[in-house]
């Protein structure tokens, strides 16, 4: 099991939690981004820089992900592709994407896109808050307790 992170838009606090978790449970965390990402020195943490371009990082994550891996992303289309490959998908606010909710989220994304293209100001996501950070940390810890490699300290 590995953790793949859609790192370009991932909050710094989430990346820091993932770095600590990688060391604690000895699981590989790979940040995929179209810009350089400085990571702490660790055999469990790596950064993969991809060329700039629409969905290049997402496409690379889909290439790398396997069944049972964990993907961290807020991108609904990437989440759907990762679920199709048998991965678990958690957003940085601590909400799980699942086979049960992905279609609804894709539909809502399409509706919002249509509203924006017709000139409606739909606003943006709420600012990342401490409660989001706590929710993510809790979900990550529960996941790693169930799925960490044998002998790891979750």
UniProtKB/Swiss-Prot annotation:
> Can you tell which superkingdom this protein's organism belongs to?
Bacteria
Which InterPro entries does the entry mention? Answer: UPF0178
An example Pfam family from this entry, by short name, is DUF188
Family recorded in the similarity comment: Belongs to the UPF0178 family.
Output the HAMAP family linked to this UniProt entry.
Answer: UPF0178
Quote the protein name from its UniProt record. UPF0178 protein H16_B0290
